[in-house]
Amino acid sequence: MNSPLYSIGSEYYLSKKVLTLLRKLDEQYGNIFSESPAALRVHDAYPGGLVTHTRNVLRFVDVILNTYPATLTCVNRNLVIFSSIVHDIGKITEYTPEVTRGKYHWFSHLGSGIEIMSRHKEDIIEVFGEEGYYRILSVIQQHHGEFSESCHTLESYIVHKADMLEAQMSKLNKDLADTGYTIPEDGLKIEFGKYKVW
C-alpha cells in the first residue's frame, strides 16, 4: 500500500491523531492518489502529479504560516495542513492515472472531494470537531479558481493562495523547460491570465 497522504503529513509535525487519520485515508485512497495527475494539461499533468502538486502546495502553506504568524493565532495549524493535503483528493475520480478524464469528471474534484470526506465525517470530527470538519469542507469547496467576494474561511483563503501559486509556477516551469529555458523574444504567455513575461 502506498501512503502518500501520511508521508506528506509526516513532514509537518502533525499530531498523532491527524497522522492516524491520514493513514486511514491512505488505506482507501493511497494507491490511486499516488498514481493520479493533478490536471490534464495545465500543471502537474502526469501520473503521480497529484502528489507533487499536493506536496508543493503544502510547502507554500507552511511558508505562509511561518512568515505571517498572525495567521497561526487565527487558525488551527493541524487543520490547515490536513486541509492542504486533502484539498484535491477529489481529483482521484476526476482524472485517471493515464492522464485522461475519469468516470465522474463532470462532477468536479470539488464535489468528489467533499463526498470522499463525508465518508470519513465521524473520524474527522473526532480529530477536529464538527466546526473543523466543515472548515475542511470549505477548503475543498472554495480553494479552486478565482477567489470570489463571498464568505470564505481563513483556511480556504490560505490554501487557495498556495494552490494558485503552485499551479502557476508549475506551469511556468514547464513552459520554460519546453522553450529550452529561454524566453522567446516576443515573450512567454502565461496561461493563467493575460500576462506575458520577458
What are these regions (language model features)?
Residues 170-173, 179-195:
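Extended, charge-rich intrinsically disordered regulatory tails
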Residues 41-42, 52, 70-178:
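Divalent metal-dependent catalytic cores for phosphoryl transfer on phosphate-bearing substrates
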